[in-house]
Amino acid sequence: MSVVGSLIFCLDCGDLLENPNAVLGSNVECSQCKAIYPKSQFSNLKVVTTTADDAFPSSLRAKKSVVKTSLKKNELKDGATIKEKCPQCGNEEMNYHTLQLRSADEGATVFYTCTSCGYKFRTNN
């Protein structure tokens, strides 16, 4: 017998064998060459499927390679300045930048850095 996916083929002639769970008795018989296989051979079969990355092409997956998903520390820079009170020192000015860290249907994450004391925090919009 030869197993391809969840299909079971006869080793002698290559014909598709019946589903062992649907066959009465203790054996599975090939309808073409009459080869006999004990049903016990099929009891612990594990079906594992895999696909190549390019098996299901999509325009969304093609765009994924264009979107940068990680940043280095020095790439964040200072960001824009906003009038926002620092919860640590009370300074009225902070730098901020946003990143889309969660799924696209959720808001961006805003990172704040105090221009005075350097305190950092983030909020999820």
UniProtKB/Swiss-Prot annotation:
It comes from the Eukaryota. Residues 1-60 are annotated as: Interaction with RPA2. The keyword Mitochondrion does not apply. Zn(2+) 2 binds at C86, C89, C114, C117. A zinc finger (C4-type) spans 10-33. Zn(2+) 1 binds at C10, C13, C30, C33. It is found in: Nucleus, Nucleolus. One of its GO terms (molecular function) is DNA-directed RNA polymerase activity. Residues 79-125 are annotated as: Required for RNA cleavage, but not essential for elongation activity. The keyword Zinc applies. GO terms for cellular component: nucleus; RNA polymerase I complex. Keywords: DNA-directed RNA polymerase, Metal-binding, Nucleus, Ribosome biogenesis, Transcription, Zinc, Zinc-finger. A zinc finger (TFIIS-type) spans 82-122. GO terms for biological process: negative regulation of transcription by RNA polymerase II; nucleolar large rRNA transcription by RNA polymerase I; ribosome biogenesis; termination of RNA polymerase I transcription; transcription by RNA polymerase I; transcription elongation by RNA polymerase I; transcription initiation at RNA polymerase I promoter. Component of the RNA polymerase I (Pol I) complex consisting of 14 subunits: RPA135, RPA190, RPC40, RPA14, RPB5, RPO26, RPA43, RPB8, RPA12, RPB10, RPC19, RPC10, RPA49 and RPA34. The complex is composed of a horseshoe-shaped core containing ten subunits (RPA135, RPA190, RPB5, RPO26, RPB8, RPB10, RPC10, RPA12, RPC19 and RPC40) where RPA135 and RPA190 form the DNA-binding cleft. Outside of the core, RPA14 and RPA43 form the stalk that mediates interactions with transcription initiation factors and newly synthesized RNA. Interacts with RPA2/RPA135. Belongs to the archaeal RpoM/eukaryotic RPA12/RPB9/RPC11 RNA polymerase family. Present with 8450 molecules/cell in log phase SD medium. DNA-dependent RNA polymerases catalyze the transcription of DNA into RNA using the four ribonucleoside triphosphates as substrates. Component of RNA polymerase I (Pol I) which synthesizes ribosomal RNA precursors. Besides, RNA polymerase I has intrinsic RNA cleavage activity. Proposed to contribute to the polymerase catalytic activity and form the polymerase active center together with the two largest subunits. Subunit RPA12 contributes a catalytic zinc ribbon that is required for RNA cleavage by Pol I. Involved in transcriptional termination. This is DNA-directed RNA polymerase I subunit RPA12. The lineage of its organism: Eukaryota, Fungi, Dikarya, Ascomycota, Saccharomycotina.
